[in-house]
Amino acid sequence: MLKLFSAFRKNKIWDFNGGIHPPEMKTQSNGTPLRQVPLAQRFVIPLKQHIGAEGELCVSVGDKVLRGQPLTRGRGKMLPVHAPTSGTVTAIAPHSTAHPSALAELSVIIDADGEDCWIPRDGWADYRSRSREELIERIHQFGVAGLGGAGFPTGVKLQGGGDKIETLIINAAECEPYITADDRLMQDCAAQVVEGIRILAHILQPREILIGIEDNKPQAISMLRAVLADSHDISLRVIPTKYPSGGAKQLTYILTGKQVPHGGRSSDIGVLMQNVGTAYAVKRAVIDGEPITERVVTLTGEAIARPGNVWARLGTPVRHLLNDAGFCPSADQMVIMGGPLMGFTLPWLDVPVVKITNCLLAPSANELGEPQEEQSCIRCSACADACPADLLPQQLYWFSKGQQHDKATTHNIADCIECGACAWVCPSNIPLVQYFRQEKAEIAAIRQEEKRAAEAKARFEARQARLEREKAARLERHKSAAVQPAAKDKDAIAAALARVKEKQAQATQPIVIKAGERPDNSAIIAAREARKAQARAKQAELQQTNDAATVADPRKTAVEAAIARAKARKLEQQQANAEPEEQIDPRKAAVEAAIARAKARKLEQQQANAEPEEQIDPRKAAVEAAIARAKARKLEQQQANAEPEEQIDPRKAAVEAAIARAKARKLEQQQANAEPEEQIDPRKAAVAAAIARVQAKKAAQQKVVNED
């Protein structure tokens, strides 16, 4: 009894909520064996036939290719595509592909040569001696993807499963009406399918392997049981026919009773699912060394004279397959890629067969029925009762129609598997799946835009942070440079510290003065004189710096000198015409003489700092020196011939002496700055200087006599 209960629990199956039972219409195509289709003249191979980015091209126009030769390189999640036959690459250009909107994707166009030559094939019959990583890499590089309709790269899926997979499920349900590709494949190639399952099991090492198949496929069930007769590691589970029991989440629940969490994957609960066609492709890739270049496609519908299942090369135009099956189109003929519930209408018949193409349905007008007009939702809740994902399709319909993306996301529109059960039972003929597909596409576009905005914001904030760091570092460097004293300041600080230490040392030593002697203040006096000399030197340095910063214009200096000479002549005339009884204040005369000397010194300094390119003409300087000497002689004669009682004005004498000294200094500087080839006679200059000194001495003596 215990064994009976254990066996019952082991073979237990669960049932999911919702689902429908549409007419199966499978007998049109599942009664004939698989057959080959003649090669087309031209093949169009899209670079992207899977979920993920397209691979990198490794062929160019004009190249000769063989069947199975890679057309792209598969790196990361990029899955390569291979040439379906031998021929020549005639173009690499965008071409409309299997998409409801007939979007153009980059494709390789090959003209077949009719020979259908393979590349050298290297099969791994002893695959059990290979490592897990080698097998996964081979499956990936041979272009194997999920052939059940999703198109997810099989190698990536196996790699992501890792060691946490406890249950491997092989999906053989094939629940959608009209489609019999997997059914016929299991009938004709059951042994190869089981061998592919064993390869997957060798890679994943699961605890149990389950094959889920609906009870409407008796021939396939018989063939699998015959192959698995001596196997105890693979369990065949026959489940009731119900749509959509072939969905990944639905079949997982039917066989294990586990539900995939919202927003999660089946691997999160230790389950990995593969399609029957995928298992067969894995066997051919690993054991036979053949990349995926063809797949089983169901050709069905009353508009096809010879329905059945064929081996269709990837890239074959749909028109070629239909014509080979006796396609008899009617007016406004519709061709559906996929099933009647989850498929889509082809915009034209030149689109190619890709890896996810499992059925081409060409229904007649009787099968389609009269077109029904879309009406308003009556909120009957029939769609909610039929939904296998436990969603509220009527609410999602209103949210999708009203562009309420947040509410649609809150109501888990992402969990919709687009099975079409809600649209099938809707009495108002509302194409709910179309609304849901459009809404999910808009939400995906919004999220992509938000992602780009977030990345742009992150880049901007990183840039701002970098600028702030650079600014802070720059301010810190400036602050450190400002705090650090300069070399001159260091010397001054060191000298001050030395003086302080010296004073402290002197203060600690007692000063002893003997009786009758004066204290020795020579050190203090010398220090005071040194400080005064240092102050004068600093003052002179500062004055030179200021004068160098504001160099006087030589022409302006000459004008000022002329004005000074004019003022001196005017002063002489006024003094000569003054009344004899008017007495001049000697202190005022001394002040004026000092002012004249200061102006003369300033004039000398400005001339010394004048620009070198504006040198004074040495001939002009010599003329002025001669004029000065003549004036000095004339002054001597006047003084000698003057009457004894005539009193000489001391102010005039002082001014003349100052002017004479200024002229003498100016003459010396002009001679020093003159060009080498125009040097003035040094003897003449010495004579002029001596005359000037004599005149100054005479003026001083005369001043003393007058004061007496």
Swiss-Prot record:
Residues holding [4Fe-4S] cluster 2: 387, 416, 419, 422
Quaternary assembly: The complex is composed of six subunits: RsxA, RsxB, RsxC, RsxD, RsxE and RsxG.
UniProt-listed Enzyme Commission number(s): 7.-.-.-
UniProt record similarity statement: Belongs to the 4Fe4S bacterial-type ferredoxin family. RnfC subfamily.
InterPro entries, alphabetized: 4Fe4S_Fe-S-bd, 4Fe4S_Fe_S_CS, Ion_transpt_RnfC/RsxC, Nuo51_FMN-bd, Nuo51_FMN-bd_sf, RnfC_N, Soluble_ligand-bd
Membrane topology reported for the UniProt record: Peripheral membrane protein
The name this protein goes by in its record: Ion-translocating oxidoreductase complex subunit C
Pfam families: Complex1_51K, Fer4_7, RnfC_N, SLBB
